[in-house]
């Protein structure tokens, strides 16, 4: 088991090293719910393992930017951080992430609902961030869940384990995007090139979320 964990972590680290983060993306923080005023739409996102910043470096900031373009002046973007550190080892825990990350995500949904009762919440997660969303959203109160209009999950590490859905949450509000050949969607933690391809799916994901507003 220790050897398997070491090999998996080594593979993940090698892929991260081969996929450098752009400086402009790294500087995006996405702390607008906590630090800003209420907006018509609040986008809450959990980044993938090893990604930096509040929104991460790939699909998180890209989805935020597309939403802001399609709903000018109406969208606040909030990443699940800093308590959620997006470490590699937490992928191997029973829920695919750790309880600290889950609690932080839950608290952000609850903050959006209490601070901005009229905002429409949309959400997303990538890789381990998708696992964060599965666990957090499934345990929210029905009142807060009702305020969530749509969720998009990229490269969902809990896709197979949870039957292609977020437990206790409407399937028509959920879009799980799994690229052909992405083995994490099949219940493994084997990282292939397909797991790094989701930037191409951002427009479709944003269309889904906008369509739910």
UniProtKB/Swiss-Prot annotation:
It comes from the Eukaryota. It is found in: Secreted. It catalyses: cutin + H2O = cutin monomers. One of its GO terms (biological process) is carbohydrate catabolic process. Its main location: secreted. Pfam families: Cutinase (PF01083). Induction: Induced during growth on cutin, in a manner dependent on transcription factors FarA and FarB. Induced during growth on suberin. Induced during growth on the lipidic carbon sources 16-hydroxyhexadecanoic acid and propyl ricinoleate (synthetic cutin monomers), triacetin and triesterate (triglycerides), and olive oil. Repressed during growth on glucose. Transmembrane segments: none annotated. The active site is at residues 127, 182, 195. SMART domains: Cutinase. Catalyzes the hydrolysis of complex carboxylic polyesters found in the cell wall of plants. Degrades cutin, a macromolecule that forms the structure of the plant cuticle. Also degrades suberin, a specialized macromolecule found in the cell wall of various plant tissues. This is Cutinase 1. It comes from Emericella nidulans (strain FGSC A4 / ATCC 38163 / CBS 112.46 / NRRL 194 / M139). The lineage of its organism: Eukaryota, Fungi, Dikarya, Ascomycota, Pezizomycotina.
